[in-house]
UniProtKB/Swiss-Prot annotation:
Similarity comment: family membership: Belongs to the TMEM248 family.
Pfam family, one: TMEM219
One Gene Ontology cellular component: membrane
Classification of source organism: Eukaryota, Metazoa, Chordata, Craniata, Vertebrata
Compartments where found: Membrane
Residues covered by region (Disordered): 78-106
Protein name stated in the entry: Transmembrane protein 248
InterPro entries: TMEM248/TMEM219 (IPR039493), TMEM248/TMEM219_dom (IPR039587)
Keywords from the named record: Membrane, Transmembrane, Transmembrane helix
Membrane topology category: Multi-pass membrane protein
Composition skew (Polar residues), residue ranges: 80-102
Organism of derivation: Homo sapiens (Human)
Length: 314
């Protein structure tokens, strides 16, 4: 009479076939990992690996810049400017939104204005300006914000439009110049190849951003992180001035994510793979329960006697 002892067969299977047991455990762990990963792709938005840079990563590059607002710089009245970056902002944005990438390469520099946090930290010798400063202007190269290739040598003009005027009146009020924080409108003027080709952040309009009646702008020098920590770094850089820092807060809407259809397809493939692995493990487990005792082990059993089998057949 044929009888099955599942627990005994399973014990013998585990003790007699260690490699297969390890294989079953590994396959089970892989199936669970694929199942978990598939569920993760189903419920979580994943950043697209095809897009190396979006506007979040691009604007974060400016966080490493130090801007020096020197006390010795000459103020420039904006009414004397005939071609300011702010005056061409609207047309530049229109070109960027309506033309193809190839056309943009031939159309010259474009202007994009975004809101950003700007802090100005005056050093002790800094006494401020007698006129109302409403605009800060600087020019950098692409490599100063970590761009590579052809864009590393591209010139980027930066104009900060302050929401309120910045002058020495604040310094006189407190007895010294204190750190100020502005939500400024930053206008970037550069070749189209410098900017990411993803969804742009909300734009601000520099012409209507400041409520000051008299506009003055001042040129600032920029220093990147590599220059800051270089051996030839000048400790007296911006000694009689104010150091400006740019801060960009991550905007989830600017991150390029994997489309829902692609995520569903990835989840389906991972689920099918995990199901196949689970079926494989269950099959091996059933084999261990039903026929787990090796044939050699049965032949070595003292109750097994070939002579008795031969006599019984006779």
């Amino acid at each position: 009479m044929f009888s099955i002892n599942p627990l005994e067969n399973l014990k013998v299977y585990i003790s007699s076939r260690p490699p297969l047991v390890v294989f079953m455990i590994s396959v089970s762990a892989m199936a669970i990992a694929f199942l978990t990963l598939g569920y993760f792709f189903k419920i979580k938005e994943i950043k697209s690996p095809e897009m190396a840079e979006d506007w979040n990563t691009f604007l974060l590059r400016f966080n490493d810049l130090d801007l020096c607002v020197s006390e010795n710089e000459t103020l420039k009245h904006l009414t004397n400017d005939t071609t300011t970056p702010e005056s061409t902002m609207t047309s530049g944005q229109a070109r960027a939104s309506t033309q193809s990438p190839q056309a943009l390469e031939d159309s010259g520099p474009v202007n994009i204005s975004v809101s950003i946090t700007l802090t100005l930290d005056p050093l002790k010798p800094f006494g401020g300006y007698s006129r109302n400063v409403t605009h800060l202007y600087s020019t950098i190269l692409g490599h100063q914000i970590g761009l590579s290739g052809r864009e590393a040598h591209e010139e980027i003009n930066i104009t900060f439009t302050l929401p309120t005027a910045w002058s020495s009146d604040d310094c006189a009020l407190h007895g010294h110049c204190e750190q100020v924080v502005f939500t400024a409108c930053m206008t970037l003027t550069a070749s189209p190849g410098v900017f990411p080709v993803t969804v742009q952040p909300p734009h601000c309009v520099p012409d209507t951003y400041s409520n000051a009646t008299l506009w003055y702008k001042i040129f600032t020098t920029a220093r990147d992180a590599n220059t800051k920590y270089a051996q030839d770094y000048n400790p007296f850089w911006c000694y009689k001035g104010a150091i400006g820092k740019v801060y960009h807060a991550l905007n989830p809407k600017l991150t390029v994510i994997v489309p829902d259809d692609d995520r569903s397809l990835i989840n389906l493939h991972l689920m099918h793979t995990s199901y196949f692995l689970f079926v494989m493990v269950i099959t091996m487990f059933c084999y261990a329960v039903i026929k787990g005792r090796p044939s050699k082990l049965r032949q070595s059993n003292p109750e097994f006697c070939p002579e008795k089998v031969a006599l019984a057949e006779a």
